[in-house]
């Protein structure tokens, strides 16, 4: 799945804390990270990967060292900057993250916050309109991309132009270190990445897909607290990859794993194409006994 997800034109990615026990010191935990790579519709897999620390080494090993070329939809963290500078990956900004900045400025600057949030709301209304058209016409593939591109060009582009003008006008008027100043600076600093989606219907307006996929890890962490070792973290990443991808395809993860383990027991080294057919997006459950007897 990792090799296939790296063939995506666009990847969503995000990370969350993944504490694990330090095997050299009893009762001490080290702070790692669990990354998720959410593949596009042609490579529909959710792949998790553990990094031992909070550096760029994990994402480098998964993407850069494996020669991923494409769009990367992510929060604007410094850990990604060198990937975008390399020219092999193109940043797609996250409007949900940008919106959060203006929402956090609501208490100290309610008037400007309301204006900014209302403009961002209009951008999401364009996306919702596209969804309704796509659903009503039962469009798929490139037809979806074209509807989204046309609607964004027609309706989102003027909203974005108006918003950018407002940001530039308000920037010198706000207190330099205020939450609103930080929100405006964030939007302007990442404007090119934030507006990249308007020209390509294949791209998404935000990184919510990755964030929602990681939410299960954050919730589960309250119960299991940490991984028992580095190897335990790696095993967890594999299991999360399988079960999350099953969930994406509405496949019963327990039934899938039960069947997969039986198949692997009979054929420990399946041919690549056979193994590909066993992945959750193509997997077919075995016939039931009642079906066999019928």
Residue ranges of model-derived segments:
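Catalytic center-proximal scaffold of phosphoryl-transfer enzymes
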Residues: 1-294
